[in-house]
Amino acid sequence: MAAEKGGSSDEERKPLTRGGMEYRDSSNSLHYSSSAASLSLAVIDRINGSTHDTGPDEIGRGDRDYSDDGEYDIEEADYIPSGGKPVQKKVKIVLGFLLFLCLSGWSLAFVLFLFGGHESSKTSIVYEDNISDTGSQGIKITLDEVFDGTWSPNSRDISWIPGPNGEDGLLLEKGASISNGYLRVEDIVSRKDPKSSKKPIVLMQKAYFNVSGEAVFPSRVWPSPDLKTVLVLSNEEKNWRHSFTGKYWLFDVESQTGQPLDPAAKDQRVQLASWSPRSDAVVFTRDNNMFLRKLSSNEVIKITTNGGVNLFYGVPDWVYEEEVFSGNSVTWWADDGEYIAFLRTNESSVPEYPVQYFVSRPNGEIPKPGGESYPETRKIKYPKAGAPNPIVDLQFFDVGKDEVFSVDIKGDFADSNRLIIEVVWASNGKVIVRSTNRESDVLHVAVIDVFSRTGKIVRKEDINALDGGWVEPSQTTRFIPADPDNGRLNDGYIDTVIYEGRDQLAYYTPIDNPKPIVLTNGHSEVVQAPSGVDLKRGLVYFVVAGNEPWERHIYSVNFDGTSLQPVTNVSESSYYDVSFSNGAGYAFLKYAGPQVPWQKVISTPANEVTFEETIEENNHLSERLRQYTLESKIYQYIDIDGFSLPVLERRPPNFNQTKKYPVLFYLYGGPGSQTVKKKFNVDFQSYVAANLGYIVVTVDGRGTGFIGRKARCIIRGNLGHFESRDQIQAAKIWAAKPYVDESRISIWGWSYGGFMALKTIEQDGGRTFKYGIAVAPVTDWRYYDSIYTERYMHTPQRNPGGYDNAAISNTTALANNIRFLVMHGTADDNVHIQNSLTFIDKLDVNNVHNYDVHFFPDSDHSIYFHNAHKIVYSRLADWLVNAFNGEWLKTYDPTPNDSILRRAATWVGMSI
């Protein structure tokens, strides 16, 4: 697609209804690359567009611009006027009367402003970023470029790997040139020193190998801890968001040959496999049963035998995969390789939800003759709010005794009221288990001793009583072994705790001590901490939301809470991510914005060796920024009801304070989430601002993360109430700005953001927001999964009024909006299409028709099937342009004028 050059880049997209009355049509839009990046909940993150000077994320459309030099008059051009011929005298009288009304209104408004009460909100600008300095002469970004990778930063995938003899700073690299090996382990320091005696260890010379005439092409690889064997996955097929199946192989490094993981069933698909810390065995799950393959034998040991449709061993069911572990494994080896802990999940009582496929057949089965015309139905055990949950308990396998057992914990939650959210092996047969009640507001931390087969609860925290909040499931607890030589007399662990209204880092020692040493405190909150632990030097590394919530910086602190030190330059407003080597002597530092992202490997400050190597600089993006025109970004706060809320405003290039711009609000808004981030990101919002010429505003309202638990927890039991108020109040603030056209304000979101878009326009009733767009929205929280929903809403049985209030149900208010759009995939296994269908039924029952709808056959929550992802954003852009150009206003009073009547009369042979 040819790029646009020249012209005033602050112009809005020209109304498609002018000059021919052509309706904006998705079918003639963009030509997308087939390599569009994938979107899921991770997609939502990308759509949410981080915050920085980059730009587009979604739609690119049309080549015509127009200058928006004044407010759009619905009576001009091709809009349909009322009938009758103009009478000059009457016009003068009317105009004079209108002028009198305007002057009176302005005077009254001025008096009210001086003496009346003001809205309890204010704005304060903190940062303004504009990394594109081409002005109006730069090339405009297109929607194609947003999705074809043109603006995607290159990102090297470097994995740290522990050395077999305790070496630190080893990297696992995959996909290197054939001459250097396809899979190899390299010492980070020696790779810059040609004289070093530490040479790379080549694990796999080639990118494939043969087993009995079958070519095996690895999709994923896991070296054994001793680096002598590689566990290889091939023929991978996706299951749900994080899970997959495939064929597993064992590849011998010395001989460069492979064999099936299970020689007796090499073609059967395996759900999960993982190495023993001793490198002598692999545990795996197939058909929901667990097996053990010892490398000393070709025989496979059955650990469980009764797994099946309703009983899972070692792998999570749908809801635990999606809402608790965000992964495909619930299997944990003890560090000595003597025991395996795993979850047993019983779904017998969980109701099923049918997902239908009208075009494809995901199960791969050919229908019987006569059945070709029927859709394929996949039934998922999906616990909706208030429905029975899967029963989950922790089991253990004694490798030496070939025995499965469980351990009872006195005072623990009942089976039906328990969520197991984390399992961490300690030393000497001890296991740390974190669990919550069903509504996720009471936390139990238990310690189990597998030697004595006993367990006890060592910590209880009633989060609901503490601040009315909840426990977010996470898997970041880090075991800290005793080391008397370094001052650690007892085992312990590091966990994230609530301290003075924010998430902070704490160290518990001994392991059964309920009172911690708080390691961090203050205004900032830790993020998925800890990120790394240096046991030798007694240091914890972690990521923190910096001086402002949209930042991320790296810090370290001693185990005793002293010597809190920044690793990154905290004087700069930046966004970093990091991964640490096994011993935390080195860090893979990833700068994500606001400028062009880069990646470096560095030695950590406590390391005696000083090292730094740039891995990626993304020079191609720096060059592109010199050619293109992007939006400017304003990071600021607004105060609403006493809460200071982060806001990102994206302004079109060549922004003109004297013009009137339409405004699109974009949000996600889910509990604990964050959309206002200071990252380099060219996304759909960038496209809307930099190409279409609209302002885009994102507000992280109450309920979102990193603004304190008081603001976060206020939403509990009443999702959508405070969040929608924040969006409405923010829209009022922007509507009052001199450069905003208050008649053209819209809002859009996906998933939770779709729910928020609908809830906001429902609560606003057309007073501030005139338009709304919801993609894959929840419309009634009774239809969403139990673990997520009840965490924030309690159960429907306990909180029926809250569920009623949260549902999108006020059709009268929705009818007061000019128009809204709903899009949904029919095979969405996450937010079921039931949400949109029942919502549309409410609209039909109440004779509401000011909306559009688009369903995508066989698409899941990310909406990708058969070109659907392109169509989502093409449709979104088309619809938005038409909305802001008054297309839907024509339906308000569709009275034909005399020209239309004359044409109709001519067509039937009459004369007027």
From Swiss-Prot:
Glycosylation site positions: N130, N210, N346, N569, N656, N810, N897
Protein topology in the membrane: Single-pass type II membrane protein
Gene3D superfamilies named in the record: alpha/beta hydrolase (3.40.50.1820), Dipeptidylpeptidase IV, N-terminal domain (2.140.10.30)
Composition skew (Basic and acidic residues), residue ranges: 7-25, 54-67
Record EC number: 3.4.14.5
PROSITE patterns tied to this protein: PRO_ENDOPEP_SER
GO biological process: proteolysis
Example of a GO MF term: aminopeptidase activity
UniProt subcellular location: Vacuole membrane
Cytoplasmic side: 1-92
Residue ranges annotated as Vacuolar topological domain: 114-912
Primary site of residence: membrane
Residues that span the membrane, as ranges: 93-113
Active site, per annotation: S751, D828, H861
Annotated keywords: Aminopeptidase, Glycoprotein, Hydrolase, Membrane, Protease, Serine protease, Signal-anchor, Transmembrane, Transmembrane helix, Vacuole
Region (Disordered): 1-29, 48-68
GO cellular component: plasma membrane; vacuolar membrane
Domain of life: Eukaryota
Covalent S-S links between cysteines: none
Catalytic activity field: Release of an N-terminal dipeptide, Xaa-Yaa-|-Zaa-, from a polypeptide, preferentially when Yaa is Pro, provided Zaa is neither Pro nor hydroxyproline
Function: Type IV dipeptidyl-peptidase which removes N-terminal dipeptides sequentially from polypeptides having unsubstituted N-termini provided that the penultimate residue is proline.
UniProt xrefs under PANTHER family: DIPEPTIDYL PEPTIDASE 10, ISOFORM B, PROTEASE FAMILY S9B,C DIPEPTIDYL-PEPTIDASE IV-RELATED
Similarity comment: family membership: Belongs to the peptidase S9B family.
Protein name in the entry: Probable dipeptidyl-aminopeptidase B
